[in-house]
Amino acid sequence: MTRYIFVTGGVVSSLGKGIASASLAAILEARGLKVTMLKLDPYINVDPGTMSPFQHGEVFVTHDGAETDLDLGHYERFIRTTMTQNNNFTTGRVYEHVLRKERRGDYLGATIQVIPHITDEIKRRIIKGAGDADVALVEIGGTVGDIESQPFLEAIRQLRFEVGARRAMLMHLTLVPYIATAGETKTKPTQHSVKELRSIGLQPDVLVCRSDHPIDVSSRRKIAQFTNVEERAVIALEDADTIYKIPGILHSQGLDDFVVERFGLQCGGADLSEWDKVVDAKLNPEHEVTIAMVGKYMELLDAYKSLIEAMSHAGITNRTKVNLRYIDSEDIENQGTGLLEGVDAILVPGGFGLRGVEGKITAVQFARENKVPYLGICLGMQVAVIEFARNVLGWKDANSTEFDRTSAHAVVGLITEWEDATGAVETRTESSDLGGTMRLGAQECQLEAGSLVHDCYTKDVIVERHRHRYEVNNNLLPQLIEAGLKISGRSGDGALVEVVEAPDHPWFVACQFHPEFTSTPRDGHPLFSGFVKAALAQHQKNS
């Protein structure tokens, strides 16, 4: 019988509901409970797949191929449960489903309304997403008071009433600001945020109070009195020097004990030793490297959230401080490769569109010719193939049909047919919709024995997640191979190029998949770990 913890946020956005929720989930998992998490997004887009990275940040891809909110990445990094398409849904997805049922006549002529039809669909999806977990944490996006969030808040109010207080509770994150001129933290914004919640029938059971200063006992007592929340359930969550400290901070204040007692759960104590090791390795590195990350969305680093975290995990695995030097690929186009001088390795991540592509190609050339360790991901692999074709094969017009459909040497082109994770055949054309039409989700990849990538994984077959609609053109592959390009990974059916390596280079690996989506702080990821090891070797060589 699943218990539900609904998580809301107030006062301001970006308080870290996802991190706080995932940290609590990690503690409950460490106590032996089966835990899952859901993210409910109030925007009207069906999913974030076509949203600008500058507005939404990263699109996290699940094992089963859903394009989801970046918070699902936090969830998978903190708990062992693999997220699916059922763990994230939007207002747009809910309305799309309800309207489709209305068109079919499923409602038998009833007037379709927010209550009960939309709220019932939200509740149905929450219950389905929770599955058979002992505890499901359900995060509602946005801030209490937003018009967009109202159907979700009403739905959780109803569900909380239907399952009862022993199976549902509400955790509310608020901001307790520090006023420097007064020299104290202020509780009034939290009081008003809870007042807003209570006006719609929701009484929080737990308050997590975010602040950049310590919150004293008297302030916590005052918050408890004015919000009708138990004092021990008013949790102070001050800014930490690493997010992986948060499970320990919440546990030290007894949040998991409160949840377990409230739900009447039978479980053991929390063993957070794995998290202690992560924090120790993160804060006490023995080495240091500088890696250039060349992308086009550098104004909003959340666009690369999982990748940045994966590099941090690789640093933890190697007890190495990884300094990422963020370089806009357009700056390389305008200022040259001097921006890359002195780095220990170069990373080119995925992306879409023509802007900044030539800068990425220049970065690849710099890495290949100067023997600097290189890791290319998704588009980072495609530009590696383009660069090789231009500067080794001599095809100066080599390109991708994404950027130039008239190129005589289109070494990268649209995938028109492939098998998805279930074995079903997918087909696409240039006129297909952008939303939900890419090669998505987990796919098998066969690795070439003796290759750099095989040395990293130490496996013949791996499974990694994809999000792309362009691939290496097999028609021109023989010439690329003859010129020395190494194909060290292919799709399970052998039809698509998945990994390439450059000849006569200490460490040059480019992959079509997104390994960052499966990296975790406790386990790291073999490819990123190998990349950081190569950067360490380069650093020692340059020292």
From Swiss-Prot:
Keyword annotations from UniProtKB, A to Z: ATP-binding, Glutamine amidotransferase, Ligase, Magnesium, Metal-binding, Nucleotide-binding, Pyrimidine biosynthesis
Gene Ontology CC: one annotated term: cytosol
This enzyme's EC code(s): 6.3.4.2
Catalytic activity: UTP + L-glutamine + ATP + H2O = CTP + L-glutamate + ADP + phosphate + 2 H(+); L-glutamine + H2O = L-glutamate + NH4(+); UTP + NH4(+) + ATP = CTP + ADP + phosphate + 2 H(+)
Binding residues annotated for L-glutamine, in chain numbering: G351, L379, G380, M381, Q382, E402, R469
Region (Amidoligase domain): 1-265
CDD domains per the UniProt record, alphabetical: CTPS_N (cd03113), GATase1_CTP_Synthase (cd01746)
Active site: residue positions: C378 (nucleophile), H514, E516
GO BP: 'de novo' CTP biosynthetic process; pyrimidine nucleobase biosynthetic process
InterPro entries: Class_I_gatase-like, CTP_synthase, CTP_synthase_N, GATASE, GATase1_CTP_Synthase, P-loop_NTPase
Binding site for ATP: S14, L15, G16, K17, G18, I19, D71
Activity control: Allosterically activated by GTP, when glutamine is the substrate; GTP has no effect on the reaction when ammonia is the substrate. The allosteric effector GTP functions by stabilizing the protein conformation that binds the tetrahedral intermediate(s) formed during glutamine hydrolysis. Inhibited by the product CTP, via allosteric rather than competitive inhibition.
Binding site for Mg(2+): D71, E139
Residues binding UTP, per UniProt: S13, K186, T187, K188, P189, T190, Q191, K222
Pathway participation: Pyrimidine metabolism; CTP biosynthesis via de novo pathway; CTP from UDP: step 2/2
A GO term for molecular function: ATP binding
Gene3D superfamilies: 3.40.50.880, P-loop containing nucleotide triphosphate hydrolases (3.40.50.300)
Taxonomic superkingdom: Bacteria
Cleaved signal peptide residues: none
Extra remark beyond the main annotation: CTPSs have evolved a hybrid strategy for distinguishing between UTP and CTP. The overlapping regions of the product feedback inhibitory and substrate sites recognize a common feature in both compounds, the triphosphate moiety. To differentiate isosteric substrate and product pyrimidine rings, an additional pocket far from the expected kinase/ligase catalytic site, specifically recognizes the cytosine and ribose portions of the product inhibitor.
UniProt record similarity statement: Belongs to the CTP synthase family.
Entry function: Catalyzes the ATP-dependent amination of UTP to CTP with either L-glutamine or ammonia as the source of nitrogen. Regulates intracellular CTP levels through interactions with the four ribonucleotide triphosphates.
UniProt name for this protein: CTP synthase
Organism this protein belongs to: Pseudomonas syringae pv. syringae (strain B728a)
Top-level taxonomy: Bacteria, Pseudomonadati, Pseudomonadota, Gammaproteobacteria, Pseudomonadales
